[in-house]
């Protein structure tokens, strides 16, 4: 039966939500009521599939905790007052922690003046952020296009590469197996997960995939494309595959890809949406090999966990294809003052507080602990790997991975799997995680694995 619109119902719902936003605490009955509401509304109006996913990785087999507020830079509190150490980091957005006071203050100050731009007058923060990124990024990267997400930043990179290379007769893109670049039509064409791709076939033509980390496969693909007249416009890849399971390429791989791109006249697009902003111990993961891309994609942590923002940064030579008509690729909300304020504050915090060095130090500490656990539990853990504060624990099968996430939830530590590799659990905490919290995470992982071994033995 068709449902008639109801202004009265919408007004009541919005008023109820506004009242909730104003609250700082909930009593027991309010907490129970909110939990029921959230579960019902997810089921009826968001997507019931999310409930089933949470049920599979949450202690007790229920639908999981309902988020309430940040407990500290590195913790979250649910509606029942339970505090969790965040080792998921919102899939990599909380590099400077939850509600970092510097970032929040910058956004609040800008909000008091002008939250969104007029579109007609020049907005100063967009200019200042573009200048800051030009100074921060490697090589000749100079001009920035701002958007709202990583997927959008990849879309902009693909369009920019097309606009630059089309007059040169180059239309093919090479991506890698296991890659994740987003789920919009263009980004999905570069992504390499059949589950995400098949329902939307056919995708954009001209995309080929080669094994990640295999430089000879990359050379062969570039050669074959040249022989058949399908010359390559760009190679797009992640320095470390995040959703693929935190897969690190062999040393020197990025350098070798850069040389191949130069040899064949292809642009190099690096997707640092997840690896950028200090996550791996460098501001950008490509800096571990001193590689300079033609186009760089950023998002996630760029907004400091406070505002969504993405950026596509390119060299002047490439970006100049948009000079004559800057309206060829635009977005209403991209580069808005609130998002730019958050990004500028985030960069300031990362540099001022030396969080890159902390990411390296604490990442080494955590990874050493996880590798020790892998040696102690070879029947459960296949490998622990990572760089900086981007780590993964790969289990012997998918079910054990789910069980580990559930057991960690019992220990009040949030973790989750990677989108392209279900048996791999990512460890991606804020770079602000304390040494004491690192020790607690390793202790929780040991307890979780011990409980899982008992369950396996009793089965």
Swiss-Prot record:
Reaction(s) this enzyme catalyzes, per UniProt: an alkane-alpha,omega-diamine + 2-oxoglutarate = an omega-aminoaldehyde + L-glutamate; putrescine + 2-oxoglutarate = 1-pyrroline + L-glutamate + H2O; cadaverine + 2-oxoglutarate = 5-aminopentanal + L-glutamate
A Pfam family matched in the record: Aminotran_3
Its biological purpose: Catalyzes the aminotransferase reaction from putrescine to 2-oxoglutarate, leading to glutamate and 4-aminobutanal, which spontaneously cyclizes to form 1-pyrroline. This is the first step in one of two pathways for putrescine degradation, where putrescine is converted into 4-aminobutanoate (gamma-aminobutyrate or GABA) via 4-aminobutanal. Also functions as a cadaverine transaminase in a a L-lysine degradation pathway to succinate that proceeds via cadaverine, glutarate and L-2-hydroxyglutarate.
Enzyme class: transferase
One biological process term in Gene Ontology: putrescine catabolic process
Documented EC number(s): 2.6.1.82, 2.6.1.29
Gene for this chain: patA
Cofactor needs: pyridoxal 5'-phosphate
Name of this protein: Putrescine aminotransferase
Transmembrane portions of the chain: none
Taxonomic lineage of the native organism: Bacteria, Pseudomonadati, Pseudomonadota, Gammaproteobacteria, Enterobacterales
Gene source species: Shigella boydii serotype 4 (strain Sb227)
Residues bearing the modification N6-(pyridoxal phosphate)lysine: 300
Protein's UniProt keywords contain Transferase: yes
Recorded metabolic or biological pathway in which this protein acts: Amine and polyamine degradation; putrescine degradation; 4-aminobutanal from putrescine (transaminase route): step 1/1
Domain of life: Bacteria
Residues reported to bind pyridoxal 5'-phosphate: 150-151, 274, 332
Keywords assigned by UniProt, alphabetized: Aminotransferase, Pyridoxal phosphate, Transferase
One Gene Ontology MF term: pyridoxal phosphate binding
PROSITE patterns referenced in this protein's UniProt entry, alphabetically: AA_TRANSFER_CLASS_3
Family from the record: Belongs to the class-III pyridoxal-phosphate-dependent aminotransferase family. Putrescine aminotransferase subfamily.
């Amino acid at each position: 039966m068709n449902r008639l619109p109801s202004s009265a119902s919408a007004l009541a719902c919005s008023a109820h939500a506004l009242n909730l936003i104003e609250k700082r605490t909930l009593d027991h009955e309010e907490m129970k009521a909110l939990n029921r509401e959230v579960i019902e509304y997810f089921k009826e109006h968001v997507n019931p599939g999310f409930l089933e996913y949470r049920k599979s990785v949450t202690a007790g087999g229920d639908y999981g905790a309902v988020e309430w507020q940040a407990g500290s830079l590195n913790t979250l509190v649910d509606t029942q007052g339970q505090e969790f150490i965040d080792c998921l980091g919102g899939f990599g957005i909380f590099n400077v922690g939850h509600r970092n006071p510097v970032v929040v203050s910058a956004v609040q100050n800008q909000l008091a003046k002008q939250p969104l731009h007029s579109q007609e007058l020049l907005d100063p923060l967009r200019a200042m952020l573009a200048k800051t990124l030009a100074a921060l990024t490697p090589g000749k990267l100079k001009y920035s296009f701002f958007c709202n997400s990583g997927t959008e930043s990849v879309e902009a990179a693909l369009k920019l590469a097309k606009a630059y290379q089309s007059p040169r007769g180059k239309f093919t893109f090479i991506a890698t197996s296991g890659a994740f670049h987003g789920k919009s039509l263009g980004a999905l064409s570069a992504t390499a997960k059949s589950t995400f791709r098949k329902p939307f076939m056919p995708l954009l033509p001209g995309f080929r995939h080669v094994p990640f980390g295999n430089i000879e496969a990359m050379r062969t693909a570039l050669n074959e494309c040249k022989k058949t007249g399908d010359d390559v416009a760009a190679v797009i890849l992640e320095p470390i595959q995040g959703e693929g399971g935190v897969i690190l390429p062999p040393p020197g791989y990025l350098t070798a890809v850069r040389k191949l791109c130069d040899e064949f006249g292809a642009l190099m697009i690096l997707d640092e949406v997840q690896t950028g902003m200090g996550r791996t111990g460098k501001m950008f993961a490509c800096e571990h090999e001193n590689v300079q891309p033609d186009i760089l994609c950023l998002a996630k942590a760029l907004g400091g966990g406070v505002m969504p923002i993405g950026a596509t940064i390119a060299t002047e030579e490439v970006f100049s294809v948009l000079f004559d008509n800057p309206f060829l690729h635009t977005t209403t909300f991209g580069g808005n003052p609130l998002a730019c304020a958050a990004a500028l504050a985030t960069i300031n915090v990362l540099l001022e507080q030396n969080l890159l060095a902390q990411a390296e130090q604490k990442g080494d500490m955590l990874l050493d602990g996880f590798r020790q656990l892998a040696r102690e539990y070879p029947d459960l853990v296949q490998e622990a790997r990572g760089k900086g504060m981007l780590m993964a624990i790969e289990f012997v099968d998918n079910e054990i991975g789910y069980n580990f996430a559930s057991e960690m939830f019992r220990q009040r530590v949030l973790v989750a799997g990677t989108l392209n590799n279900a048996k791999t659990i990512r460890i991606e905490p804020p770079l602000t995680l304390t040494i004491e919290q690192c020790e607690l995470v390793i202790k929780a992982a040991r307890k979780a694995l011990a409980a899982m071994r008992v369950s396996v033995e009793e089965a």
